[in-house]
């Protein structure tokens, strides 16, 4: 089946979340579970109340079955997010966040909000961070040249969102430069 051109060069948000499912996160199991051999790794025996690192997809599945509580990553603590938001608003550069921060936050907020303290404040702060970063990305695209675009510390979803625009802009810039060099 042929896909529209814009879908050929980027992933859907659902595909990005699927990829984020391979990121590791801490859980606290609610009961003892045997060692679990996976394709990519083996999850050791899980015993409550000891934390265990598992892929996000497994954490969400265990949460759904009430077999574990998800421990939000440190970067999702309200104080750290407030610092990141302030940094995003005060500086022209992007703050350092995990590569799949947006997808991970979306999955955690949608499927285990009851495991997150101050969840509504965290949602609001994450939205502020997202809007500040989108504004910076747009500004970066406006300042583009035909050779490169430097947007360090962008996350996977952010890169995926600007990829179609970036590709089109770069193609047009190359054509303009090529025409001006021919003249």
From Swiss-Prot:
Record keywords, A-Z: Chromosome partition, DNA replication, Nucleus
Gene name tied to this protein: psf2
Keyword Cell wall biogenesis/degradation carried by entry: no
Superkingdom assignment: Eukaryota
Descriptive protein name: DNA replication complex GINS protein psf2
Provenance organism: Schizosaccharomyces pombe (strain 972 / ATCC 24843)
Quaternary state and interactors: Component of the GINS complex which is a heterotetramer of sld5, psf1, psf2 and psf3. Interacts with sld5.
Family affiliation: Belongs to the GINS2/PSF2 family.
Subcellular location: Nucleus
InterPro entries from the UniProt entry: GINS_A, GINS_bundle-like_dom_sf, GINS_Psf2, PSF2_N
Primary subcellular site in the record, as a coarse category: nucleus
Resulting phenotype, residue 133 to K: In psf2-209; temperature-sensitive
């Amino acid at each position: 089946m042929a896909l529209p051109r814009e879908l050929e060069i980027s992933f859907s948000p659902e595909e990005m979340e699927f990829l984020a499912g391979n990121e590791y996160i801490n859980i606290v199991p609610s009961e003892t579970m045997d060692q679990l051999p996976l394709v990519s790794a083996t999850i050791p025996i899980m015993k409550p109340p000891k934390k265990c690192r598992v892929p996000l997809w497994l954490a969400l599945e265990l949460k759904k079955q009430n077999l574990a509580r998800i421990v939000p990553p440190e970067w999702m603590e309200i104080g750290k997010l407030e610092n990141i938001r302030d940094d995003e608003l005060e500086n022209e550069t992007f703050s350092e966040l995990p590569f799949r921060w947006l997808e991970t936050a979306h999955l955690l907020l949608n499927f285990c909000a009851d495991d997150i303290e101050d969840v509504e404040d965290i949602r609001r702060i994450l939205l502020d961070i997202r809007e500040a970063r989108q504004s910076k990305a747009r500004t970066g695209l406006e300042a583009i040249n035909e050779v490169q675009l430097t947007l360090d510390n962008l996350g996977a979803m952010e890169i995926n969102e600007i990829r179609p625009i970036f590709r089109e802009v770069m193609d047009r810039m190359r054509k303009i430069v090529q025409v001006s060099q021919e003249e």
